[in-house]
Amino acid sequence: MRVSDFDFELPAERIALRPAIPRDAARLMTVAAGGAIGDLRVSDLPSLLRAGDTLVFNDTRVIPARLAGERDRNGLKLSVKATLLKRLSVSRWTALMKPGKRLRVGDKVHFTPAPLRGGAEGSRIGGEVGRRSGATPNGLPAPPSGADALAATVEAKSEDGQITLAFDLSGPALDDAIAMVGAMPLPPYIAALRPEDDQDRQDYQTVYAREDGSVAAPTAGLHFTPSLLAALEAKGIGRAFVTLHVGAGTFLPVKVEAVADHNMHAETGEISSQTADALNAIRAAGGRIVCVGTTALRLLETATDEAGVVHPFAGDTAIFITPGYRFRAADVLMTNFHLPKSTLLMLVSAFAGVETTRTAYRHAVDGGYRFYSYGDAGLWFRRDAS
């Protein structure tokens, strides 16, 4: 297949710059296994699932991965920006930096706090309103401002432009410093239209996030509220949590012409033995596995064998799901509306069928659905599922 097979026209006004309020007021397009389309709200989700089904959530937490500061080389200062990509150890991260070509191995970089801009009260990371002012996510005092707020040394530079930073802090102390110094890494299609502000620290985080490590949100989960979770539980719909730390590669364009030639980026994830056992029991009892987001689906498919048995998993996955893939674990997928020619649109096309997906996306565009991270969602029933 050609990448151009997954192209479509999207008017700029369809790109959502803010989420629905409340979160579960977002529109929800349902796409049945046979292709029938319905128009509802996310708050209607309990009526669309059955007792015994289980929602699989990605509990990763977005970190404020955008850092700004100065390189100091023998008194020669240079303003720099960094986007953290992947944690390598308790004190080391890979990052994309500007201007990366002017940085050398051994350079010292001092990062300073990002200015606060409007928005709601509460956490800089979001999702836990009410932390005391000046405190980190762990309730610790904020690191000092100025040149000593957070420092790192350029440890290595790779041919693909990534830079390895060795920070002066490690473990929870480093996490706390990043939380106070960094800014939320809004997707490029939003950042190009407006600046990040304090409201994003809540909006760009799921209410159940708990494992720090992502530089992009698992956006399908942004629609869930405590009241919606309670309504699902009251109907007998279960929940399970997996962790996949979403990397900046999720926004990278596909630059090849043939789908088969694309080199998929890797992301780090984990499924516990308890979660694997629970999902296998749900499937054995006739319940459906409902993946909340493509990240949960990709991790679950990585950890599931040909017989449909989910196994514990810890490591990297670079699974690239395209039409023709045989799904092993997921029965239903809830996901936002994705970019043209993206790997995520290819995944949805594999799940629901290429023509069904094209028809549904035309319906979404014509019907005024809001697209991308802060936009509306679709509930897709696998094309070969009963």
Identify what each model region corresponds to.
Residues 1-113, 138, 147-386:
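Surface-exposed, charge/polar-rich loops and edge strands
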Residues 113-148:
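Intrinsic disorder/low-complexity segments
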